[in-house]
């Protein structure tokens, strides 16, 4: 599985990657990169003993399906995948690569479907978005068969603390300074 790190930053540019590599953090989520650049991103991270979770739906120039997942895992050697697509989660698991199922909670129906998908797919983790739904997912946090993550709309360390104290295992943030400022 992934290294222990409560707050995982999302890295979207080479400049942000360079800043990330100056921190002691061991893992990040890569998104918004073009497929041609993603291999370099992963190589740079691995050279510095960092792990990369690839958000497959937000990689430019790649189909975000099971074949795209297979390419990222087998040829680019991503350490984990994050996706809202069941076929991608299944492909990651088939390749013994950690899989994070991203769920967007828009209403009670999407919450119910997300819980059902989590039970069926058995991902290594499930990430709920936006993070503000954490009071609604409290029952699932206790009974989830995997780690429960939250992401989206996280503005400060106080919000991270609220989430982790409610049972959320990990939090994803788009602001690297939040990841480096968090002290458990």
Where are the model-predicted features located?
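Conserved beta-strand positions in the central sheet of alpha/beta enzyme cores
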Residues: 29, 53, 82, 100-101, ...
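Glycine-rich phosphate-binding active-site loops on the catalytic face of alpha/beta enzymes
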Residues: 30, 130-136, 152-184
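Conserved, mostly hydrophobic/aromatic
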Residues: 20, 85, 126, 163
């Amino acid at each position: 599985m992934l290294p222990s790190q409560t707050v995982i930053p999302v890295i979207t540019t080479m400049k942000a990657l360079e800043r990330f590599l100056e921190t002691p953090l061991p893992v990040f989520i890569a998104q918004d990169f073009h497929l041609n650049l993603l291999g370099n991103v992963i190589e740079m991270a691995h050279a510095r003993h960092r792990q990369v979770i690839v958000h497959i739906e937000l990689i430019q120039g790649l189909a975000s399906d099971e074949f795209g997942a297979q390419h990222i895992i087998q040829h680019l050697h991503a350490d984990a995948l994050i996706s809202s697509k069941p076929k991608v989660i299944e492909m990651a698991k088939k390749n013994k690569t950690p899989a994070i199922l991203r769920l967007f909670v828009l209403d009670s129906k999407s919450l119910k479907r997300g819980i059902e998908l989590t039970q069926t797919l058995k991902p290594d983790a499930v990430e709920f978005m936006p993070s503000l739904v954490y009071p609604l997912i409290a029952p699932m946090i206790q009974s989830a068969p995997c780690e429960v993550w939250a992401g989206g709309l996280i503005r400060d360390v106080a919000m991270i603390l609220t989430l982790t104290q409610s049972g959320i295992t990990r939090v994803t943030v788009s602001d690297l300074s939040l990841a480096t400022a968090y002290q458990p």
